[in-house]
């Protein structure tokens, strides 16, 4: 009985770090940084860079808004030119967001009406990782 109890305690001690790591990563706060000059979106989770994606930003006459905004709405499904997902931003003076594009050749340029364009696969990957409220 004593040996069984010792083995059970050892098993718990060995397995616990696996579950603790999952809990820690699930509660890590993520944030998005958009560099409009470099045309790059960086996802930070905690203090680590979790992903970097090339983007397209607003054209000269319709620039991407600058500031700190939160994701406040999410849509998924086929959306024509917007790809398959949309992350809406709480920009007070307009309807802007992060979304895919059916014009992947525009990535790396100033081509949108102010939104942040991504390759469809990149937008889907980001959509899966960030909830409403993400800055």
Kindly label every feature range from the protein language model.
Residues 7-8, 27:
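Compositionally biased, low-complexity intrinsically disordered regions
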Residues 1-4:
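Positively charged n-region of N-terminal signal peptides that target proteins for export
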Residues 16-24:
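Membrane-interface motif at the C-terminal end of an N-terminal transmembrane signal
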Residues 8-17:
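Bacterial N-terminal signal peptides
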Residues 25-60:
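A structural motif detector for short, solvent-exposed N-terminal "entry" segments of globular domains
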Residues 23-31, 59-68, 73-135:
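Exported/periplasmic cell-wall-interacting domains
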């Amino acid at each position: 009985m004593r040996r069984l109890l010792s083995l059970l305690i050892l098993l718990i001690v060995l397995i616990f770090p696996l579950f603790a790591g999952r809990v820690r990563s699930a509660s890590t706060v993520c944030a998005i940084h958009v560099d409009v000059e470099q045309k790059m979106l960086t996802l930070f989770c905690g203090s680590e860079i979790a992903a970097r994606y090339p983007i397209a930003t607003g054209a000269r006459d319709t620039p991407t808004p600058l500031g700190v905004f939160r994701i406040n709405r999410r849509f998924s499904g086929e959306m024509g030119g917007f790809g398959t997902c949309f992350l809406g931003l709480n920009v007070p003076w307009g309807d802007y967001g992060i979304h895919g594009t059916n014009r992947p050749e525009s990535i790396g340029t100033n081509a949108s009406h102010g939104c942040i364009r991504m390759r469809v696969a990149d937008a889907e990957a980001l959509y899966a990782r960030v909830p409403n409220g993400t800055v």
